[in-house]
Regions:
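Non-catalytic helical/linker scaffolds that mediate oligomerization, partner binding
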Residues: 1-290
Length: 290
């Protein structure tokens, strides 16, 4: 993986690396892998061959937790709906398997043989979507994964992301908005597994696609404007127009000073109030670059 990273860096590429964990060696070295990889795929099918099958559920849960703590996307994959390769309906065990991955708070689910060569590819996708959507509604509101903040760390982005998510439990905040150049703030917000969506307004379409894997993140591309303040207000107007927000909604807003720097402030606004005073209000770092 280090060799791949070196090649990508040599070509100034921002292609992401997803590490496939398929054997005991991958499980044993997950901490080191997470330091280098951009995300992880839990390949249960291959793992089931390499390690005792009764260990797979525990390994899956451990890997998901470690990825969340590392703020890296995690995908649960293989044999999610294996029965649907040849049959139009899943087994109850498969339904429960998908739901449990959601309850463990995975970022993404993946089909393989079901859509690659199965007889019911569209039905498999629809079935997984329905099960996942219901599991999202049924999962416990209380998140049992606590992400500690290092007291010796100066990671302002992580600190403000945690405060923003915590604020949604104390105030009637309906969404957290962040303008996103590389997606780091959005991924930090995703790691805290909040109840309300993270609306990442992306300067680059590629960033929007990268964030598609992150938990609870709705990534939206919007071209750059003259400054960050105008960008924020333009985003609010667009979100209102698309029905993603309502005028009376309260939102949190995280942003930074300029590209390549960590998030530097958190604001909480009512949408209509923010837009009403858009012409005369000055946000922190109003001239920031995206």
């Amino acid at each position: 993986m280090l060799d791949i990273r070196e090649i990508l860096d040599a070509h100034n590429s921002d292609i992401r690396i997803i590490a496939k964990i398929e054997n005991q060696e991958g499980v044993d070295n997950i901490d080191e892998i997470l330091e280098v990889a951009d995300g992880v795929m839990v390949a249960r099918g291959d793992l089931g061959i390499e390690v005792p099958q009764e260990r797979i559920p525990g390994i899956q849960r451990t890997l998901i937790r470690k990825c969340i703590l590392a703020k890296k996307p995690v995908i649960v994959a293989t044999q999610m709906l294996h029965t649907m390769i040849n049959n139009p309906r899943p087994t109850r065990a498969e339904v429960t398997d998908i739901a449990n991955a959601i309850y463990y708070r995975t970022d993404a689910l993946m089909l393989s043989g079901e859509t690659a060569y199965g007889k019911y590819p569209v039905e498999a996708v629809k079935t997984m979507t329905k099960i996942a959507a219901q599991a999202e509604k049924d999962k416990l509101e209380e998140n049992d994964i606590r992400i500690p903040l290092d007291e010796n760390s100066n990671d302002v982005t992580a600190f403000l992301a945690k405060q923003a998510v915590k604020a949604t439990t104390k105030l009637k905040i309906r969404a957290i908005i962040t303008d996103s150049y590389q997606g780091r703030t959005a991924r930090n917000l995703a790691a805290f597994r909040g109840k309300y969506p993270v609306l990442a307004i992306c300067y680059k379409e590629k960033t929007m696609r990268h964030l598609a894997l992150s938990y609870g993140v709705e990534a939206i591309y919007m071209p750059e404007l003259a400054n960050g303040q105008e960008y924020y207000f333009a985003a609010l107007r667009r979100l209102l127009k698309e029905g993603r927000l309502h005028p009376t909604d309260m939102v949190g807003y995280l942003s930074s000073g300029k590209a390549g720097t960590q998030t530097s402030f958190l604001e909480i606004n009512v949408v209509e109030d923010a837009l009403k005073h858009a012409g005369d209000s000055v946000l922190p770092n109003s001239n920031r670059y995206l």
